[in-house]
């Protein structure tokens, strides 16, 4: 009996030690884009190789602001649960930029071909040239980053339970700032793969589309973000586009200076509430069934709300307690 108890205790201690050893912290204190220790590329490669839960990549402020990591080629896809944190944000509110302009060349959206290489532009299907790629991975956190000058800033593809919070997502043309999509690789939706992600408290500035929820993305929360476009944006399209995305919640955001503040194409049962939409060509541009628009402020747009025809004659859109004026 004593021998069995000893063996059991040894096994438990071994498992505990293994668990403690599995989570690692990788420090990024060099901004050169190479695979040497201390670079962002090295840190992602190390985390992917470890593939354990709750790794952390801490990106330090190096030198004087602005803090910019300029990439010379695409980063590795993120394959493990990891927190990637720009450490300056908690201290001063400053972001550390990850910039793709060294290798993504061309004029605006023309530098970003779609899935069909002969097409380009915000409203063609694409997963081309993203900055950070979360594909078939869960439990990733991105915080304190400025993800800048890619075709897609962050691609969340068939991935769930990820958190994107307190970032600046800027100047990503041709696709979107953040794309959450269940795309199976052939343009078909997958309904249970891109769920329960949270996009909170971010600044979306001068992206083609600010954010997309497409091809099966469901039960995601997008809250308390600013979606804005300036005259520097060559193709301001939608603040948020929902395409075959269902049961998502879009709450407490502000949309300004876009073609459409928020557009839904064939989405169902999305809850859109407590948002402000101003100075867009169209505030809400809608099709779909069972979508609810509750307590939004829609003002100063060229057209406040456009409800387009839906092939399902029984489709319903609910507008309740919204303030709509000056459109």
Show where each model-derived region lies.
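Cleavable N-terminal signal peptides
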Residues: 10-11, 21
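N-terminal, post-signal-peptide segments of secreted/periplasmic proteins
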Residues: 23-153, 158-160, 325-326
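Short loop/turn segments at connectors of secondary-structure elements within structured domains
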Residues: 22, 51-53, 65, 78, ...
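Extracellular beta-strand/beta-solenoid scaffold signature
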Residues: 107-133, 149-156, 171-194, 205-217, ...
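Bacterial N-terminal signal peptides that target proteins for export
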Residues: 1-10
């Amino acid at each position: 009996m004593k021998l069995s108890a000893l063996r059991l205790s040894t096994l438990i201690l071994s498992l505990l030690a293994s668990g403690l050893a599995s989570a690692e912290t990788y420090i990024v204190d060099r901004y050169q884009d190479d695979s040497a220790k201390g670079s962002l590329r090295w840190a992602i490669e190390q985390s992917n190789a470890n593939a354990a839960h709750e790794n952390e990549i801490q990106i330090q402020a190096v030198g004087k602001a602005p803090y910019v990591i300029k990439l010379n080629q695409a980063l590795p896809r993120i394959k493990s649960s990891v927190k990637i944190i720009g450490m300056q944000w908690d201290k001063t509110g400053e972001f550390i930029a990850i910039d793709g302009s060294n290798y993504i060349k061309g004029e605006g959206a023309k530098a970003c071909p779609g899935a069909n290489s002969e097409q380009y532009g915000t409203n063609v299907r694409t997963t081309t040239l993203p900055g950070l790629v979360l594909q078939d991975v869960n439990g990733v956190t991105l915080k304190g980053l400025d993800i800048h000058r890619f075709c897609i800033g962050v691609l969340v593809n068939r991935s769930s339970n990820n958190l994107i919070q307190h970032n600046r997502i800027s100047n990503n043309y041709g696709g979107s700032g953040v794309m959450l999509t269940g795309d199976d690789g052939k343009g078909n939706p997958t309904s249970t793969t891109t769920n329960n992600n949270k996009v909170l408290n971010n600044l979306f500035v001068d992206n083609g589309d600010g954010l997309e929820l497409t091809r099966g993305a469901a039960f995601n929360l997008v809250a308390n973000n600013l979606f804005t476009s300036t005259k520097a944006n060559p193709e301001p399209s939608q603040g948020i586009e929902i395409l075959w995305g269902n049961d998502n919640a879009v709450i407490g955001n502000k949309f300004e200076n876009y073609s459409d503040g928020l557009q839904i194409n064939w989405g169902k049962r999305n809850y859109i509430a407590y948002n402000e939409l101003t100075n867009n060509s169209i505030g809400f541009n809608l099709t779909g069934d069972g979508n609810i628009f509750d307590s939004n402020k829609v003002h100063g747009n060229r057209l406040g709300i456009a409800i387009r025809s839906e092939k399902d004659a029984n489709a319903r859109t609910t507008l309740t307690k919204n303030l709509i004026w000056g459109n």
